[in-house]
């Protein structure tokens, strides 16, 4: 991102340049045709990440783990993982090592988080955020909060709800940081969806 100036030049369709507040990644002034808004909203309507208690406990091999995670992330369009990525995260100590080559809820929960964060933060910063989480909240609590907040932010960005909900009953610095990360991810997903819809319109 290049500061808080317009990051994308407006073209002759009448929409103005995108303005991103680096602190909150808020979007402004992107008028769109109604049918385009509807298509974007429909693409995300059924999105839901599995909660921690819903992640398979039987143990999944690497390729099964990749398919499981990517199937849930597919509606977002830009967060897929590959086997080499996962192996690298394990090698760097970013996520716990598999047990007898199998991945369980602990590893899978962290992989969902890394998938959301990897386009926004360096691996070093992701590692620091995971360390912060471990010292503050259990993984099931932190992971489920991420799921709820991501769905909350996405549905608001895509016009499926009028206002953001307050997720959780406590406030902390760690929670504020995670909320900011999730908000940023929702904006990136929104922008990718917007430009993909524009590309499709031009091809029609």
Model-derived regions: residue spans:
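Intrinsically disordered, low-complexity, charge-dense segments enriched in Lys/Arg
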Residues: 132, 136-204
């Amino acid at each position: 991102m290049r500061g808080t100036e317009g990051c994308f030049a407006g073209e002759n369709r009448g929409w103005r340049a995108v303005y991103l507040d680096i602190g909150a990644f808020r979007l402004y002034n992107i008028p769109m045709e109604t049918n385009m808004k509807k298509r974007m909203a429909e693409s995300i309507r059924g999105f839901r990440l599995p909660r921690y208690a819903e992640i398979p406990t039987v143990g999944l091999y690497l390729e099964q783990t990749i398919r499981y995670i990517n199937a849930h992330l597919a509606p977002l369009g830009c967060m897929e993982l590959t086997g080499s990525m996962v192996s690298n995260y394990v090698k760097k100590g970013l996520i716990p090592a598999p047990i007898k080559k199998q991945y369980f809820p602990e590893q899978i929960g962290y992989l969902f988080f890394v998938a959301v964060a990897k386009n926004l933060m360096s691996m070093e910063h992701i590692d620091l955020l995971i360390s912060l989480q471990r010292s503050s909240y259990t993984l099931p609590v932190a992971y489920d909060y991420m799921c709820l907040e991501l769905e909350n932010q996405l549905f608001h960005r895509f016009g499926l709800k009028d206002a953001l909900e307050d997720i959780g009953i406590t406030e902390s610095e760690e929670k504020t940081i995670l909320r900011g990360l999730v908000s940023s991810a929702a904006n990136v997903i929104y922008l990718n969806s917007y430009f993909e819809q524009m590309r499709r319109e031009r091809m029609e």
